[in-house]
């Protein structure tokens, strides 16, 4: 893919965000791009290839926001970008003369998405790639929900390589936990715990202790100081998280 891009646009500056998205996991890809893209300069072209439907009739799309461009399959991988942006143009990429000849049905990242991204970065304007569409695939991110007056239920969105359990609970969902001195609560993950402390950093936790911390992704994380909360709690992606406040 990089070779294709550089062959078309030798001056391209290619930055790898990640190659650690879980295989076939469109939501994991959506989470990765949504957390990274806004830190890049205006005009950046983001090539997002998490494409378990490669070779099927799913559409290649070009999404343009106020500051960024995204080239991706139309499978929902840009759903969290749609959630963050207010001015969006989405186009079905149909201009096949920008694709590589003799296209494979198993590697559209190389044969379709990379040459489109390279030509876009080189200066070809978005309308040249295809017409706008409004029926693009978009899924709703899972949101925490109240179970009763004192209990909030969420899930684990992701386990990072350190074993931190990243929940879908944002500060506005649990404002009482945003203070590191918060008391009168307990958190369970998959029924295990309880976790009764919010720390201001990973290093503030005691060795072997599982605790909550507000992470850089903007969500509540369950972590362990120099350890794996995932292993300590036997929990993974999709596990239920319960936050119970004292009555």
Describe each region flagged by the PLM.
Residues 12-15, 44-47, 60-62, 68-71, ...:
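Structural motif
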Residues 231-232, 237-247:
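Pepsin/retropepsin-fold aspartyl endopeptidases
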Residues 166-234:
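A conserved acidic, glycine/proline-rich C-terminal tail/linker
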Residues 25-31, 39-43, 47-50, 55-111:
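Active-site histidine-anchored catalytic micro-motif
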Residues 100-180:
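Anionic-ligand-binding alpha/beta catalytic cores of soluble enzymes and soluble regulatory domains
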Residues 1-21:
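N-terminal glycine-rich anion-binding loop in soluble enzyme alpha/beta folds
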Residues 3-4, 32-35, 80, 112-119:
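Alpha-helical scaffold segments in soluble metabolic enzymes
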């Amino acid at each position: 893919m990089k070779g294709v891009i550089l062959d078309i646009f030798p001056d391209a500056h290619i930055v790898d965000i990640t190659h650690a998205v879980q295989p076939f996991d469109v939501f994991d890809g959506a989470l990765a791009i949504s957390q990274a893209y806004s830190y890049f300069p205006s005009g950046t072209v983001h090539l997002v290839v998490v494409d378990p439907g490669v070779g099927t009739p799913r559409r290649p799309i070009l999404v343009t926001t106020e500051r960024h461009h995204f080239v991706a399959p139309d499978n929902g991988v840009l759903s969290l970008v749609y959630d963050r942006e207010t001015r969006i143009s989405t186009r079905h990429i149909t201009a096949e003369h920008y694709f590589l000849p003799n296209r494979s049905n198993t590697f559209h990242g190389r044969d379709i998405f990379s040459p489109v991204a390279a030509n876009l970065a080189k200066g070809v304007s978005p309308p040249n790639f295809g017409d706008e569409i409004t029926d693009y695939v978009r899924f709703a991110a899972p949101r925490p929900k109240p179970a009763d007056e004192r209990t909030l239920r969420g899930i684990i969105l992701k386990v990072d390589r350190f074993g931190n359990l990243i929940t879908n609970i944002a500060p506005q969902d649990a404002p009482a936990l945003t203070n590191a001195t918060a008391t009168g609560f307990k958190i369970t993950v998959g029924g295990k715990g309880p976790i009764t402390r919010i720390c201001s950093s990973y290093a503030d936790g005691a060795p072997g202790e599982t605790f909550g911390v507000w992470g850089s992704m903007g969500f509540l994380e369950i972590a362990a100081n120099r350890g794996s909360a995932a292993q300590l709690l036997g929990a993974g992606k999709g596990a239920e998280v319960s936050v119970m406040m004292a009555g």
